Amino acid sequence: MAQTSTTLSGAKSHVVDISGADISFTSTSGVYTIKSDGTVLTGAGKLAALDLVTVTNSTNNNSTFTVKAVVSTTEFTVEEIVTTETADGSTSVTLDHTGFVTDKAKGDGYYSQPDGVHTVAYQIVNLGDSTDDFNGTIKMQGTLATTPTEDDWFDISGTTLTSDQSTTNHAYNF
Protein backbone atom coordinates (compact mmCIF):
# COMPACT_ATOMS: atom_id res chain seq x y z
CA MET A 1 0.00 0.00 0.00
CA ALA A 2 1.31 3.43 -0.88
CA GLN A 3 2.33 5.77 1.87
CA THR A 4 -0.06 8.57 2.64
CA SER A 5 0.03 11.50 4.97
CA THR A 6 -2.81 13.12 6.87
CA THR A 7 -2.49 16.52 8.49
CA LEU A 8 -4.69 16.70 11.57
CA SER A 9 -3.99 20.33 12.40
CA GLY A 10 -2.21 23.30 10.95
CA ALA A 11 -0.55 26.07 12.90
CA LYS A 12 -2.31 27.19 16.06
CA SER A 13 -1.71 30.31 18.13
CA HIS A 14 -2.66 31.17 21.67
CA VAL A 15 -5.75 33.36 22.00
CA VAL A 16 -5.52 36.09 24.63
CA ASP A 17 -7.91 35.85 27.56
CA ILE A 18 -11.43 37.12 26.88
CA SER A 19 -13.23 38.76 29.80
CA GLY A 20 -16.67 40.24 30.11
CA ALA A 21 -19.41 40.95 32.64
CA ASP A 22 -21.93 39.98 29.93
CA ILE A 23 -20.91 36.30 29.53
CA SER A 24 -23.65 33.78 30.30
CA PHE A 25 -24.18 30.02 30.12
CA THR A 26 -27.29 28.12 29.01
CA SER A 27 -28.31 24.49 29.01
CA THR A 28 -31.34 23.80 26.83
CA SER A 29 -32.43 20.32 25.69
CA GLY A 30 -28.87 18.96 25.68
CA VAL A 31 -27.34 21.98 23.93
CA TYR A 32 -24.75 23.78 26.07
CA THR A 33 -24.00 27.38 25.13
CA ILE A 34 -21.61 30.12 26.24
CA LYS A 35 -22.55 33.57 24.95
CA SER A 36 -22.22 37.27 25.58
CA ASP A 37 -24.37 40.30 24.93
CA GLY A 38 -21.59 42.16 23.14
CA THR A 39 -18.12 40.83 23.98
CA VAL A 40 -16.62 39.21 20.87
CA LEU A 41 -15.80 35.57 21.65
CA THR A 42 -15.16 34.01 18.22
CA GLY A 43 -13.78 35.04 14.85
CA ALA A 44 -10.33 36.21 13.75
CA GLY A 45 -7.87 35.94 16.64
CA LYS A 46 -10.57 34.62 18.98
CA LEU A 47 -11.97 31.19 19.91
CA ALA A 48 -12.79 28.58 17.25
CA ALA A 49 -14.29 25.11 17.03
CA LEU A 50 -12.23 22.44 18.86
CA ASP A 51 -10.48 24.99 21.10
CA LEU A 52 -10.24 24.24 24.81
CA VAL A 53 -11.33 27.13 27.00
CA THR A 54 -11.02 27.35 30.77
CA VAL A 55 -13.66 29.48 32.47
CA THR A 56 -12.83 31.34 35.69
CA ASN A 57 -14.72 33.73 37.94
CA SER A 58 -18.15 32.33 37.10
CA THR A 59 -20.56 31.21 39.80
CA ASN A 60 -21.22 27.67 38.53
CA ASN A 61 -19.07 26.99 35.46
CA ASN A 62 -15.41 27.25 36.46
CA SER A 63 -14.15 24.40 34.30
CA THR A 64 -12.55 23.56 30.95
CA PHE A 65 -14.83 23.23 27.93
CA THR A 66 -14.34 22.12 24.32
CA VAL A 67 -15.81 24.49 21.72
CA LYS A 68 -18.18 22.32 19.67
CA ALA A 69 -19.45 24.87 17.17
CA VAL A 70 -19.42 28.61 16.60
CA VAL A 71 -22.94 30.06 16.45
CA SER A 72 -21.96 33.72 16.03
CA THR A 73 -19.16 36.08 17.09
CA THR A 74 -20.78 36.30 20.52
CA GLU A 75 -21.94 32.69 20.99
CA PHE A 76 -20.63 29.13 20.79
CA THR A 77 -21.73 25.67 21.90
CA VAL A 78 -19.57 23.32 23.97
CA GLU A 79 -19.28 19.53 24.30
CA GLU A 80 -19.47 19.48 28.08
CA ILE A 81 -22.45 20.19 30.32
CA VAL A 82 -22.81 23.76 31.57
CA THR A 83 -25.07 25.00 34.34
CA THR A 84 -27.41 27.79 33.27
CA GLU A 85 -26.03 31.05 34.64
CA THR A 86 -26.95 34.58 33.61
CA ALA A 87 -24.49 37.45 33.46
CA ASP A 88 -24.92 39.83 36.38
CA GLY A 89 -23.34 42.81 34.63
CA SER A 90 -20.67 43.32 37.27
CA THR A 91 -18.74 40.05 37.65
CA SER A 92 -16.18 39.70 34.87
CA VAL A 93 -16.00 36.08 33.70
CA THR A 94 -12.73 35.09 31.98
CA LEU A 95 -12.35 32.63 29.11
CA ASP A 96 -8.74 31.38 28.87
CA HIS A 97 -7.70 29.53 25.70
CA THR A 98 -5.82 26.55 27.16
CA GLY A 99 -5.38 24.35 24.10
CA PHE A 100 -7.20 22.55 21.33
CA VAL A 101 -8.17 19.11 20.10
CA THR A 102 -8.26 17.89 16.50
CA ASP A 103 -10.86 16.07 14.49
CA LYS A 104 -10.61 12.31 14.46
CA ALA A 105 -9.18 10.65 11.35
CA LYS A 106 -9.68 7.08 10.20
CA GLY A 107 -6.49 5.02 10.15
CA ASP A 108 -5.61 2.06 7.97
CA GLY A 109 -7.16 -0.40 10.44
CA TYR A 110 -10.55 1.06 9.60
CA TYR A 111 -9.94 0.12 5.96
CA SER A 112 -8.97 -3.49 6.90
CA GLN A 113 -5.25 -2.74 6.48
CA PRO A 114 -3.98 -3.16 10.06
CA ASP A 115 -0.34 -3.50 9.09
CA GLY A 116 2.59 -1.20 8.76
CA VAL A 117 4.33 1.41 10.82
CA HIS A 118 2.75 4.73 11.64
CA THR A 119 4.63 7.94 12.31
CA VAL A 120 3.34 10.98 14.09
CA ALA A 121 5.31 14.22 13.90
CA TYR A 122 4.92 17.34 15.99
CA GLN A 123 6.53 20.66 15.13
CA ILE A 124 6.52 23.16 17.97
CA VAL A 125 7.30 26.72 16.89
CA ASN A 126 8.33 29.54 19.20
CA LEU A 127 7.39 32.79 17.47
CA GLY A 128 9.82 34.85 19.48
CA ASP A 129 8.07 36.18 22.54
CA SER A 130 7.11 34.46 25.78
CA THR A 131 3.37 34.91 25.21
CA ASP A 132 3.26 32.22 22.53
CA ASP A 133 5.71 29.61 23.85
CA PHE A 134 4.19 26.14 23.91
CA ASN A 135 4.41 24.68 27.36
CA GLY A 136 2.29 21.59 27.70
CA THR A 137 1.54 18.10 26.46
CA ILE A 138 0.48 16.69 23.11
CA LYS A 139 -1.00 13.18 22.94
CA MET A 140 -1.82 10.89 20.03
CA GLN A 141 -4.91 8.77 20.65
CA GLY A 142 -6.30 5.75 18.83
CA THR A 143 -9.17 3.30 18.89
CA LEU A 144 -9.82 -0.22 17.66
CA ALA A 145 -13.54 0.39 17.20
CA THR A 146 -14.87 0.96 13.67
CA THR A 147 -17.57 3.29 14.99
CA PRO A 148 -15.97 4.65 18.16
CA THR A 149 -17.66 6.48 20.98
CA GLU A 150 -15.77 8.92 23.20
CA ASP A 151 -15.03 6.08 25.65
CA ASP A 152 -13.28 3.93 22.98
CA TRP A 153 -10.21 6.14 22.62
CA PHE A 154 -6.88 5.48 24.36
CA ASP A 155 -3.49 7.21 24.48
CA ILE A 156 -0.97 5.54 22.16
CA SER A 157 2.09 4.81 24.28
CA GLY A 158 5.36 6.36 23.18
CA THR A 159 3.75 9.28 21.31
CA THR A 160 3.25 11.81 24.11
CA LEU A 161 5.27 15.00 23.93
CA THR A 162 5.76 17.32 26.87
CA SER A 163 7.59 20.34 25.52
CA ASP A 164 9.92 22.73 27.26
CA GLN A 165 10.89 24.44 23.95
CA SER A 166 14.39 22.92 24.00
CA THR A 167 13.57 20.79 20.92
CA THR A 168 10.95 21.84 18.40
CA ASN A 169 10.63 18.83 16.04
CA HIS A 170 9.54 15.44 17.33
CA ALA A 171 8.60 12.19 15.57
CA TYR A 172 7.35 8.91 17.01
CA ASN A 173 6.70 5.53 15.38
CA PHE A 174 4.06 3.08 16.53
Tell what function each PLM region has:
Residues 2-6:
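Predominantly extracellular/luminal regions of secreted and cell-surface proteins
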Residues 10-47, 56-100:
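Small/polar beta-strand repeat architecture
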Residues 13, 97-112, 143:
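Short Trp-Ser/Thr-centered turn/loop motifs at beta-strand boundaries
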Residues 53, 114-132:
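A short beta-strand element within beta-rich, extracytoplasmic domains
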Residues 63, 116, 134-136:
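Residues that flank catalytic or metal-binding motifs in active/ligand-binding sites
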Residues 100, 108-114, 154-174:
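Beta-sandwich interaction modules
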Residues 132-154:
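Short, surface-exposed beta-strand/strand-loop-strand elements in extracellular ectodomains
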